[in-house]
C-alpha cells in the first residue's frame, strides 16, 4: 500500500513523493517511508533524521525550525505529534465504524473490556485496546489476544495500523483506553470517535505531567479536542471532577450522558454487596432495572455504568445493554478473584498502585468481608514519591492487616521506599520479598477473611535495579493458596 505525501497532509507539495510507510521509530524506516522526527522525553527524533534519509526515507515530518539540506521534503508542523497521528490515520485509511474511548485515573482498562464484552453480547465483532493489549471478541468464539499487555496507548502510528487491521478483520466496534500520556502525546488524535467516557480523576502521573492542572488538562483534551461536536460524552456524575468534564464536553458541542448515583442517563438507585458480586437497581429512560452484577466493589458498579453508557451512546438499546452487564467478567488483575484460602477466606489480585486505587479496592472489598481484610502492597521506584505515605496511611487505616512489600523498586533502594510507606502506616508489617509477603498473608487467612494483593494486577515482572524478574501476582497467590501447608 502506498499514498502520496499530499494525501497524508491534505495539502500540495512541490515535491510529492510516494509514501510506503509511516513511523516515528527510525529503526523501522526503509525505502519510501515518512519518518516523524519527534522530540521525546529521552531522545530527540530530529537527531535521527539524517540517518532515516540514508535508510531511504522519502520525507521527514518535524517541528518548526532546523533540519535543512536533507535532500527530501521536510514537512513542518507547530504540533508535529498531532500531524503524525493524522498522517498515520490517513495512510492506513480504515477504522471500525464505531470507536469509543475512555479516560480517567482508574477504571479505563475495566471499562474498555466491559464495552468489548457488551458489544459482543449484542452480536457485534468487537475489540478493546489498552493496558491489556488488543483483544478481539465475536459471538460464539474464544477471545483473540492480538497483542500482549503493554502500554495503555501505543504510538500513534501503531494505533493507526492496528485500527486498520481490526477493520480488515471485520471488527465493527472498538473501545480504546485513552491514558493522559497518550492523549497528551497525541497518540489517538487520528481516531474518529463516536463517543468518549470519563471514570474519575485523582492524583497520579505527576512525575510526567508536573502538576494536577497539567494532568487534568491532558484528560480534558479527550473532550475539548478529540471528541467531535454532536458526539456523546459519558461522564461519571459521582466524581468531583464531573463539572469540569461536563463543561468541556458542552463547550465542544457534545451531549452529556451522566451515570452514577447522581447520573441522569443511567441512575444507580441502589447497590447491595453479595458473596457472588452485587445487586444493582438502575434507572434508564424512566424504566427501573434490577441487575445481578457478578463483580465485587462499588468502583466496578461505577465502571460498568460508564461502559453501559458508552455502548448506549454507540447506538445500542439501553435495556439490552443493561441485561448484558449480568454476564461481564472482570479484566485480568482488576479485583480478580484468585481462589479460597486453605482455612477459608477469599483472595483477590488488583492493579491498584495509586492512593485512590488502593482506597477504592479496600473500600470495595470491605462489604464482602465478614472477618479480617488483609492487604499486601508497595509503591514503585522512580515514580511519584508523594504517594508513598498516602498509600501507607490508606493501607493502615482501611485494612485490618497491612503488609508492606516491594513493587517494582527500579533503581531506588527498596528499603527506603518501604520506609516512606511505613512512616505513615502504624501497625503495618514489613516483608520486602513479595513472594514471602504473599505467603505470609495467605497463612493469616481464615473463614470470612478477604486478602487483596495490590499493585501489579496483570503485570508479569518485578523490576529491580533495571532487571525485570518474572513475577505474576495471580500465579504467586494461587500457589500460596494451594501450597501454604505443604
Curated annotation (Swiss-Prot):
InterPro entries membership: Mur-like_cat_sf (IPR036565), Mur_ligase_C (IPR004101), Mur_ligase_C_dom_sf (IPR036615), Mur_ligase_cen (IPR013221), Mur_ligase_N (IPR000713), MurE/MurF_N (IPR035911), UDP-N-AcMur-Glu-dNH2Pim_ligase (IPR005761)
Top-level lineage group: Bacteria
Single GO MF descriptor: UDP-N-acetylmuramoylalanyl-D-glutamate-2,6-diaminopimelate ligase activity
Cysteines joined through disulfide linkages: none
Main EC class the enzyme belongs to: ligase
Binding site for ATP: 104-110
Coiled-coil features, chain-numbered ranges: none
Binding residues annotated for UDP-N-acetyl-alpha-D-muramoyl-L-alanyl-D-glutamate, in chain numbering: 26, 152-153, 179, 185, 187
Catalytic reaction annotation: UDP-N-acetyl-alpha-D-muramoyl-L-alanyl-D-glutamate + meso-2,6-diaminopimelate + ATP = UDP-N-acetyl-alpha-D-muramoyl-L-alanyl-gamma-D-glutamyl-meso-2,6-diaminopimelate + ADP + phosphate + H(+)
Pathway: Cell wall biogenesis; peptidoglycan biosynthesis
GO biological process terms on file: cell division; cell wall organization; peptidoglycan biosynthetic process; regulation of cell shape
Keyword Signal (UniProt): no
Binding residues annotated for meso-2,6-diaminopimelate, in chain numbering: 383, 407-410, 455, 459
Family as reported in the entry's similarity comment: Belongs to the MurCDEF family. MurE subfamily.
NCBIfam families: murE (TIGR01085), PRK00139.1-2 (NF001124), PRK00139.1-4 (NF001126)
Function, as annotated: Catalyzes the addition of meso-diaminopimelic acid to the nucleotide precursor UDP-N-acetylmuramoyl-L-alanyl-D-glutamate (UMAG) in the biosynthesis of bacterial cell-wall peptidoglycan.
Protein's recorded name: UDP-N-acetylmuramoyl-L-alanyl-D-glutamate--2,6-diaminopimelate ligase
Protein's organism: Caulobacter vibrioides (strain ATCC 19089 / CIP 103742 / CB 15)
Amino acid at each position: 500500500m502506498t499514498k502520496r505525501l499530499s494525501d497524508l497532509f491534505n495539502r500540495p507539495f512541490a515535491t510529492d513523493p510516494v509514501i510506503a510507510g509511516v513511523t516515528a521509530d527510525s529503526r523501522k524506516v526503509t525505502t519510501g517511508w515518512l519518518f516523524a522526527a519527534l522530540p521525546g522525553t529521552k531522545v530527540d527524533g530530529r537527531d535521527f533524521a539524517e540517518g532515516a534519509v540514508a535508510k531511504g526515507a522519502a520525507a521527514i515530518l518535524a517541528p518548526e525550525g532546523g533540519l535543512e539540506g536533507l535532500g527530501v521534503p521536510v514537512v513542518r508542523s507547530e504540533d508535529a505529534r498531532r500531524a503524525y497521528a493524522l498522517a498515520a490515520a490517513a495512510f492506513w485509511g480504515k477504522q471500525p465504524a464505531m470507536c469509543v474511548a475512555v479516560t480517567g485515573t482508574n477504571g479505563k482498562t475495566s471499562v474498555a473490556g466491559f464495552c468489548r464484552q457488551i458489544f459482543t453480547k449484542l452480536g457485534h465483532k468487537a475489540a478493546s485496546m489498552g493496558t491489556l493489549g488488543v483483544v478481539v471478541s465475536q459471538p460464539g468464539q474464544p477471545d483473540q489476544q492480538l497483542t500482549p499487555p503493554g502500554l495503555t496507548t501505543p504510538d500513534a502510528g501503531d494505533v493507526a495500523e492496528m485500527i486498520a487491521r481490526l477493520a480488515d478483520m471485520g471488527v465493527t466496534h472498538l473501545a480504546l483506553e485513552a491514558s493522559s500520556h497518550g492523549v497528551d502525546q497525541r497518540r489517538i488524535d487520528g481516531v474518529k470517535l463516536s463517543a468518549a467516557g470519563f471514570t474519575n480523576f485523582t492524583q497520579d502521573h505527576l512525575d510526567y505531567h508536573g502538576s494536577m492542572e497539567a494532568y487534568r488538562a491532558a484528560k480534558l483534551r479527550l473532550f475539548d479536542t478529540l471528541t467531535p461536536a454532536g458526539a456523546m460524552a459519558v461522564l461519571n456524575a459521582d466524581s468531583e471532577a464531573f463539572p469540569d468534564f461536563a463543561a468541556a464536553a458542552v463547550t465542544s458541542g457534545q451531549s452529556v450522558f451522566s451515570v452514577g448515583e447522581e447520573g441522569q442517563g443511567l441512575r444507580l438507585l441502589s447497590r447491595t454487596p453479595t458473596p457472588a458480586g452485587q445487586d444493582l437497581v438502575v434507572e434508564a429512560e424512566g424504566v427501573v432495572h434490577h441487575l445481578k452484577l457478578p463483580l465485587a466493589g462499588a468502583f466496578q458498579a461505577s465502571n460498568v455504568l460508564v461502559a453501559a453508557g458508552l455502548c448506549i451512546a454507540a447506538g445500542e438499546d439501553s435495556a439490552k445493554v443493561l441485561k448484558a452487564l449480568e454476564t461481564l467478567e472482570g479484566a485480568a488483575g482488576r479485583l480478580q478473584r484468585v481462589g479460597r484460602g486453605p482455612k477459608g477466606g477469599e483472595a483477590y489480585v488488583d492493579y491498584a498502585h495509586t492512593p485512590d486505587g488502593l482506597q477504592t479496592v479496600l473500600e470495595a472489598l470491605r462489604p464482602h468481608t465478614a472477618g479480617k481484610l488483609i492487604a499486601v502492597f508497595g509503591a514503585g521506584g522512580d515514580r511519584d514519591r508523594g504517594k508513598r505515605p498516602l498509600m501507607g496511611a490508606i493501607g493502615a487505616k482501611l485494612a485490618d492487616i497491612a503488609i508492606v512489600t516491594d513493587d517494582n523498586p527500579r533503581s531506588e533502594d527498596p528499603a527506603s521506599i518501604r520506609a516512606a510507606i511505613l512512616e505513615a502506616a502504624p501497625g503495618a508489617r514489613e516483608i520486602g520479598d513479595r513472594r514471602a509477603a504473599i505467603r505470609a498473608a495467605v497463612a493469616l487467612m481464615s473463614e470470612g477473611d478477604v486478602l487483596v494483593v495490590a499493585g501489579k494486577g496483570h503485570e508479569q515482572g518485578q523490576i529491580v535495579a533495571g532487571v525485570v524478574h518474572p513475577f505474576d501476582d495471580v500465579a504467586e497467590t494461587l500457589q500460596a493458596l494451594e501450597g501454604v501447608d505443604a
